[in-house]
Regions:
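Active-site activation/catalytic loop segments of kinase-like enzymes and analogous catalytic loops
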Residues: 160-194, 205-213
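Conserved protein kinase catalytic core
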Residues: 82, 135, 155, 167, ...
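Short pocket-lining segment of the protein kinase catalytic domain that shapes the ATP-binding cleft
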Residues: 73-81
């Protein structure tokens, strides 16, 4: 669907493509009056919409569904800034703590009807792609305020999300946090063990895609 068609369909004054992630989905930012909305389309987006609907129904902070169809989704904008932004140095310890707080709150949810696509036993609600760009922080309070990109959300091993954020924080895309020491600190703030072998195990699985059915 081209940008003009999207604008007409949803009554938007402006439509701008957003380049995010590696999922292959099309994402377009739409401005409609005072609202900022996001249109997402591609394989698996209907599954993501189901997960987003469930997460919103239990009151966890995430984008709200405005409309949906066959492998497309229109959502509200999350408040705050994502954790991959260049936060002021003085704020970064609090941002790390907020990332850990958000994951702990997600893990403790109950009643999730979806399994994680990753192997490994556990009873935590896992995001499945808990990386810095998918976690939002309130810039005023420095508290966790939401998550997005939920296509892999499901019940599984809590070390999955610890591993994926560990990878995100120690990698070259988020040098502002200081690399490996920050990744280890995040796991400790959560209450985990940064030397647990499951961290490297899940990073390897994610990199290889071998968890996919």
């Amino acid at each position: 669907m081209d940008l003009n068609t999207l604008q007409d369909r949803f009554g938007a004054a402006n439509a701008e493509p957003v380049h995010v992630g590696c999922s292959g989905a099309t994402v377009v930012r739409l401005d409609r009056g005072s609202e900022r909305l996001y249109y997402k389309a591609g394989p698996g987006v209907s599954d993501e919409a189901d997960r987003l609907a469930w997460l919103g129904s239990v009151g966890f902070p995430c984008p709200q569904i405005v409309d949906r169809g066959n492998n497309w989704l229109l959502t509200t904008e999350l408040p705050g800034r994502d954790a991959s932004q260049d936060w002021p140095a003085a704020d970064r310890p609090a941002v790390l703590a907020a990332i850990a707080d958000g994951l702990r709150a997600l893990d403790q949810l109950s009643g999730c009807p979806f399994p994680s696509p990753f192997p490994g036993r556990g009873d935590a609600v896992t995001h499945g792609d808990y990386a810095a760009p998918n976690v939002f922080i309130d810039p005023d309070t420095l508290r966790f305020c939401g998550i997005l990109d939920l296509g892999r959300l499901g019940v599984g091993d809590r070390y999955l999300d610890l591993a994926l954020m560990f990878k995100s924080l120690r990698g070259s895309l988020n040098p502002q946090y200081g690399g490996l020491p920050a990744a280890r600190r995040f796991v400790e703030l959560y209450g985990g063990d940064p030397d647990d072998p499951r961290i490297e195990h899940y990073i390897t699985l994610d990199d290889s895609g071998d968890y996919m059915p």
